[in-house]
């Protein structure tokens, strides 16, 4: 049986949350902070989805991804689903850094999940 991309993303993001609990410095290298992106740390536009503000934040992001992601993946296929996820994540990250003040730190996968609405 093939594993769905939705469940794979949920597994990876949830595992990253556990890594962050054990290694808090993980947050320092993955959270979205405009001054770091401006200095060339472009990976943060994507790694922001790996860190969350707490267990409740993680739960609601992953629950929403599960509820919305499964039907989208079933309808469009794994590849298109992943394209939507990562384009939405990038778009959400760019909106976050350009619509908030320079000292705002963003975390979570909400931008990617909102792309499925």
List PLM regions with ranges:
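Alpha-helical transmembrane segments and their membrane-interface exit regions
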Residues: 114-117
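N-terminal TM1-TM2 helical hairpin plus the immediately adjacent luminal interfacial "cap"
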Residues: 2-109
